[in-house]
């Protein structure tokens, strides 16, 4: 929940009439506030430490991003469309914003345009910091603290420290710059980036000093701000910094802060909507049903949140590219709507909001004033924070696309500190076959993060590409010590061991790879190829059959299985798989040639001639097919000498 967004002014309207400060410092009570709002990070860190012992960072991130990040959009949506008075007040926003954002997000993901990702990121950071600022305003309202300087310094603290944590995070900054350059954005010189980082850090220190001086001054003169608010600021900002800069895996960091944000949001929205339902008889239907005072309905509330978030979870696991793009557009539109709606439906400065939170005072409405109507100002804000930047990013990407290697080189120049930029640059170089440079970048990445198992594996692959097998082995051993249950790493190491002739060890790692990745067609296919080299034909055939169960449209698996069955003497079985391979890939010349040999073995010479001829039509330089065609034609001439004259 936030008081402000890109669509509202960073100020709070003074309450009126003035009331005596309330002595209650808490929104609920001391222990519940500490658990749900202030001390939540202290509980989340050990919980996530235990979770990482069971699940990978990627699994934790996907689960939280789905059921938490998207799921917590639902309560705001229920209020937007279930509160009749609110809907009437902002009807056109609630009608047109979803249609507009869904169309834009779907279009951007359909055509793989990255600009929308930057918009979501910046809106998301703003949304997170404004939720913290919103809680500051609520806690100060509890003690009757409404002076302008206090709220402005609170706002400045939230903005500057959230921005500083991102600017000084090598992962966050490099990822943001990478997306920006992926959109074709102009190069930002390293001096600009580095001076900007120094400036924002100095600004954060200066604002903190001003905040502390003001707090002490107010305390001395007897106008004491709520100390719980100060504790909230400290824990929120410190936790945001920890999640962006100090966690071992950034995915875990993102998930950690998301859960903190969601717990705060969901609990406060439950309290607000429940009070709203009790005090406003005009609210009916689904919103009244869900937010009645009933312990069992809390379970329903959580269940609805998880059900809404399941859309994002399904999207993360769906395999169909078209459906994935559509669902990603839907999830992104929901995210932006959540950020947008929270900018105006939860303004604590308005009397109705305060009453539902147990606060006094406030204003009936907010008149922005000015020379232009409110809807014009609102449209200008949309243009400033969405339409114009997104339009520029779209234009750059469609007209000024930058090659990946160049992009990553720019990112490394801007952010030379940190493992991620060097790793991404190395990956881009490796794709281009520039292995010497890739190896150097991987080594730099490992200097910053020696425990990056993926970097060790990628370096081993690059060294293998240089035929430096002995140098690659220690990196694979390190990667597997760090992540012993990573099936992909076992597969890479098995392939490496196979190449240096350590077949007994390779067999163990191939078996581990297929055990840890039982649904990976590639793992089973690689293991099958290994078994073929050992002459274990029955096991080889069984693995290929498993591959085709997992991926029926795998022409090379069909081809190899057909060859194995052919060698075993199962001609009819081989024929079926040759034909299946050709249905999947009609240009697979080897399949035509081998099917021709099968027909030749069966004495179906005319059919063999057809297959060899087709192989030569597709590849006129296919010598084996040419020789086989001559053999078939000679056999045909012996059978039908008159026809050959």
Residue spans of the language-model regions?
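Internal/C-terminal transmembrane anchor helices
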Residues: 231-234, 370-399
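Conserved alpha-helical positions within TPR/SEL1-like repeat arrays
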Residues: 420-430, 454-464, 488-498, 522-529, ...
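Structural signature of tandem alpha-helical TPR/SEL1-like repeats
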Residues: 400-412, 431-444, 454, 465-478, ...
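Membrane-interface helix-loop-helix junctions at boundaries between adjacent transmembrane segments
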Residues: 107-197
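Central hydrophobic cores of alpha-helical transmembrane segments in multi-pass inner-membrane proteins
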Residues: 61-80, 128-134
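Hydrophobic alpha-helical transmembrane segments in integral membrane proteins
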Residues: 388-413, 420
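Short coil loop/turn residues that delineate tetratricopeptide repeat
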Residues: 417-418, 451, 485, 519, ...
């Amino acid at each position: 929940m936030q008081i402000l967004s890109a669509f509202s002014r960073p100020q709070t309207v003074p309450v009126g009439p003035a009331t005596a400060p309330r002595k209650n410092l808490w929104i609920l009570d001391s222990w519940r506030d500490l658990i749900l709002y202030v001390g939540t990070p202290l509980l989340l860190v050990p919980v996530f430490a235990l979770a990482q012992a069971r699940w990978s960072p990627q699994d934790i991130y996907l689960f939280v991003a789905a059921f938490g990040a998207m799921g917590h959009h639902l309560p705001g949506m229920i209020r937007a469309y279930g509160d009749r008075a609110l809907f009437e007040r902002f009807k056109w926003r609630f009608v047109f914003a979803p249609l507009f954002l869904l169309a834009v997000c779907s279009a951007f993901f359909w055509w793989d345009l990255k600009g929308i990702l930057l918009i979501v990121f910046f809106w998301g950071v703003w949304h997170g910091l404004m939720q913290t600022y919103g809680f500051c305003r609520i806690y100060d309202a509890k003690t009757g603290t409404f002076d302008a300087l206090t709220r402005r310094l609170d706002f400045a603290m939230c903005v500057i420290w959230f921005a500083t944590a991102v600017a000084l995070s090598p992962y966050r900054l490099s990822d943001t710059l990478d997306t920006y350059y992926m959109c074709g954005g102009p190069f930002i010189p390293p001096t600009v980036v580095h001076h900007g980082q120094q400036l924002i850090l100095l600004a954060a220190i200066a604002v903190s000093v001003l905040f502390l001086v003001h707090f002490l001054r107010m305390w001395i003169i007897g106008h004491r701000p709520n100390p719980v608010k100060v504790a909230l600021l400290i824990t929120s900002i410190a936790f945001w910094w920890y999640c962006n800069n100090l966690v071992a895996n950034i995915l875990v960091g993102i998930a950690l802060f998301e859960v903190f944000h969601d717990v705060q949001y969901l609990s406060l929205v439950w309290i607000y909507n429940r009070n709203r339902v009790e005090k406003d008889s005009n609210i009916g239907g689904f919103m009244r049903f869900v937010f009645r005072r009933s312990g069992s309905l809390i379970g329903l509330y959580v269940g609805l949140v998880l059900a809404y978030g399941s859309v994002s979870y399904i999207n993360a696991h769906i395999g169909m590219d078209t459906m994935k793009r559509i669902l990603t557009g839907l999830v992104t539109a929901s995210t932006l709507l959540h950020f947008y709606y929270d900018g105006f439906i939860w303004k604590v400065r308005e009397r109705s909001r305060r009453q539902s939170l147990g606060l006094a005072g406030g204003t009936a409405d907010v008149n922005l004033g000015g020379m232009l109507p409110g809807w014009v100002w609102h449209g200008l804000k949309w243009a400033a924070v969405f339409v114009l930047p997104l339009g520029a990013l779209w234009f750059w990407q469609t007209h000024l696309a930058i090659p990946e290697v160049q992009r990553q080189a720019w990112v490394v120049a801007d952010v030379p500190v940190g493992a991620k930029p060097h790793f991404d640059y190395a990956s881009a170089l490796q794709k281009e076959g520039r292995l010497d440079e890739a190896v150097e970048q991987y080594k730099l990445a490992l200097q910053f993060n020696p425990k990056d198992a993926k970097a060790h594996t990628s370096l081993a692959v690059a060294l293998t590409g240089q035929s430096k097998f002995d140098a690659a082995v220690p990196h694979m051993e390190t990667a597997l010590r760090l992540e012993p249950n990573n099936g992909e790493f076992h597969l890479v190491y098995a392939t490496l061991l196979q190449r240096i002739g350590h077949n007994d060890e390779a067999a163990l790692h191939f078996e581990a790879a297929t055990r840890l990745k039982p649904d990976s067609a590639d793992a089973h296919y690689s293991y099958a190829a290994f078994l073929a080299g050992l002459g274990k034909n029955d096991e080889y055939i069984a693995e290929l059959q498993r591959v085709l169960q997992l991926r029926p449209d795998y022409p090379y698996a069909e081809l190899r299985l057909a060859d194995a069955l052919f060698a075993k003497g199962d001609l009819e079985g081989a024929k079926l798989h040759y034909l299946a391979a050709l249905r999947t890939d009609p240009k697979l010349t080897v399949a035509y040639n081998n099917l021709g040999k099968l027909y030749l073995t069966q004495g179906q010479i005319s059919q063999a001639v057809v297959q060899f001829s087709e192989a030569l039509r597709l590849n006129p330089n296919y010598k084996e097919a040419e020789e086989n065609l001559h053999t078939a034609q000679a056999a045909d001439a012996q059978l039908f000498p008159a026809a050959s004259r």
